[in-house]
């Protein structure tokens, strides 16, 4: 039994099948990239795995239990960062981290922002930051979270090369410590091929 399992997932949108019969099992320490063309259902699959959406058929299990039966404990173990940063634009970068990680002290939050490349921007309201900087505020949570499972939709959007390298190193560290990372990205991952598992979506199935 793996930590996260997709079992015979079917997803249809506008009378079109995005994928069907999609099954896979993820174990501790896995780093997974969901690939496929635009419209293949990558974001849809991520939302199914978070429990934000339900499949038309099949189920997602966490540690052998259907998500709807273990929703609270699952979400305690999940960090989800979608296309939208999901941050409070009227708050500062530092206030955002305090909001999401109430048990994190100020020093930890400042260090997380520094790791994300936001040193010097801690006290600026997020609505005054660039799109890339706003994305970094959300991604700074990677240095604070205790969640086992990270699901990240295009985390490198609007991030420069150095930022991508830092984020990639943080993901590698998380998986080396037994965590799971699932992401979509159009950018090449600068890591050994042996470290990445790819699940490729076609119109009707996963390869």
From Swiss-Prot:
Enzyme Commission number: 7.6.2.5
InterPro entries per record: AAA+_ATPase (IPR003593), ABC_transporter-like_ATP-bd (IPR003439), ABC_transporter-like_CS (IPR017871), ABC_transptr_haem_export_CcmA (IPR005895), P-loop_NTPase (IPR027417)
Catalytic reactions of this protein: heme b(in) + ATP + H2O = heme b(out) + ADP + phosphate + H(+)
Primary location class: membrane
Protein name: Cytochrome c biogenesis ATP-binding export protein CcmA
Annotated ranges, domain ABC transporter: 4-207
Subunit structure and binding partners: The complex is composed of two ATP-binding proteins (CcmA) and two transmembrane proteins (CcmB).
Location(s), subcellular: Cell inner membrane
Family from the record: Belongs to the ABC transporter superfamily. CcmA exporter (TC 3.A.1.107) family.
Domain of life: Bacteria
Gene name of the encoded protein: ccmA
Role description: Part of the ABC transporter complex CcmAB involved in the biogenesis of c-type cytochromes; once thought to export heme, this seems not to be the case, but its exact role is uncertain. Responsible for energy coupling to the transport system.
This protein's UniProt keywords: ATP-binding, Cell inner membrane, Cell membrane, Cytochrome c-type biogenesis, Membrane, Nucleotide-binding, Translocase, Transport
Keyword Disulfide bond assigned: no
């Amino acid at each position: 039994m793996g930590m996260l399992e997709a079992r015979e997932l079917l997803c249809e949108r506008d009378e079109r099948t995005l994928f069907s019969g999609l099954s896979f099992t993820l174990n501790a320490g896995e780093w997974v990239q969901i690939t496929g063309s635009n419209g293949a259902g990558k974001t849809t699959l991520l939302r199914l795995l978070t429990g934000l959406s339900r499949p038309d058929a099949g189920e997602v299990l966490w540690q052998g239990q259907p998500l709807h039966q273990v929703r609270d404990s699952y979400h305690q173990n999940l960090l989800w960062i979608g296309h939208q940063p999901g941050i409070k634009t009227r708050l500062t970068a530092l206030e955002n981290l305090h909001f999401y990680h109430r048990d994190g002290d100020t020093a930890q939050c400042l260090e997380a922002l520094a790791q994300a490349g936001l040193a010097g921007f801690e006290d600026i309201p997020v609505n005054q930051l660039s799109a890339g900087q706003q994305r970094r505020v959300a991604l700074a949570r990677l240095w604070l979270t205790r969640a086992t499972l990270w699901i990240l939709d295009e985390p490198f959007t609007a991030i420069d090369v150095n930022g991508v390298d830092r984020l990639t190193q943080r993901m590698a560290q998380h998986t080396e410590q037994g965590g799971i990372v699932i992401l979509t990205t159009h950018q090449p991952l600068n890591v050994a091929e042996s470290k990445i598992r790819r699940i490729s979506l076609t119109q009707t199935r996963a390869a």
